[in-house]
């Protein structure tokens, strides 16, 4: 729950469980952040439930212990109590519905994202499009890490790290990697759509409602987990 350079937040949600590779990654990242920025480490949000699986609220992902939310609120050197970690909130970094960063966004935020994305264990990172465009404009030298920063809805209070499947875990299937290149043009297109939304398509078909989650739709391993409870 607490280390020298990290703290898990919102413990009452019981979503601070991850695979060993995820725990190692978060601890490693927190040390790097404390060393290379003015932050004292990182605040860790949701990872997964104790036995994985879908959650009742908040996420469609975070089901197999390889996803983690990292708050964009800079960590201080103060150790927060459990009660404080329930009440303190992260802060939004977006302006104009995510088209731009706001005045709270700093060079240290960019460094944290660079450190997070540069790790070989990372598959992709989700962040609001305005932040990606800001980093595209300011980054010089090695830009390869930008490829892993993917623009996505929300994600302006935290960024979402998704790790690659651990070696030897046959039941885990990696997503296709992000397209080649730094992905900056794609992020710019996201911003353009925010600032100048396309008109609604009068011929668009209504979205189908999401199918309910049933045990039959979950991986076979879930049956064994639930049977053991």
Regions found by a protein language model. Give the residues of each.
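Catalytic cores and adjacent binding grooves of peptidoglycan-active enzymes
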Residues: 80-229
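Short, solvent-exposed beta-strand-terminating loops
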Residues: 72-82
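Extended, low-complexity, intrinsically disordered C-terminal regulatory tails
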Residues: 25-57, 124-148
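Short secondary-structure capping micro-motifs at structural edges
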Residues: 55-59, 111-112
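Extracytoplasmic
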Residues: 37-39, 63-68, 156-158
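Short, functionally critical alpha-helical segments immediately adjacent to catalytic or ligand/cofactor-binding
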Residues: 44-48, 67, 161
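Short, surface-exposed glycine/acidic/tryptophan-bearing loops
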Residues: 57-74
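Active-site acidic/histidine clusters and adjacent loop/turn architecture
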Residues: 1-44, 105-115, 119-122
């Amino acid at each position: 729950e607490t280390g020298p350079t990290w703290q898990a937040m919102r413990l009452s949600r019981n979503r601070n469980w991850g695979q060993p590779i995820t725990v190692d990654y978060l601890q490693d990242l927190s040390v790097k952040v404390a060393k290379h920025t003015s932050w004292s480490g990182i605040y860790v949000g949701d990872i997964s439930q104790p036995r994985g699986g879908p959650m009742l609220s908040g996420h469609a992902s975070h089901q197999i212990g390889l996803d983690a939310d990292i708050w964009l609120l800079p960590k201080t050197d103060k150790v927060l109590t459990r009660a404080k970690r329930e009440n303190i909130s992260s802060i939004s970094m977006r302006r104009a519905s995510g088209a731009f960063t706001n005045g709270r966004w700093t060079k240290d935020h960019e460094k944290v994202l660079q450190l997070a994305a540069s790790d070989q264990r990372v598959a992709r990172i989700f962040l609001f499009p305005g932040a990606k465009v800001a980093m595209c404009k300011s980054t010089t030298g090695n830009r390869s890490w930008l490829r892993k920063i993917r623009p996505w809805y929300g994600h302006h209070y935290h960024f979402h790290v998704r790790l690659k499947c651990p070696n030897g875990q046959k039941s885990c299937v990696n997503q296709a990697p992000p397209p080649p290149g730094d992905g900056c043009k794609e992020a710019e297109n996201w911003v353009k759509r925010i600032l100048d939304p396309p008109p609604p398509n009068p011929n668009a078909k209504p979205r189908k409602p999401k199918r309910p989650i049933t045990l039959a739709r979950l991986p076979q391993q879930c049956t064994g987990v639930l049977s053991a409870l």
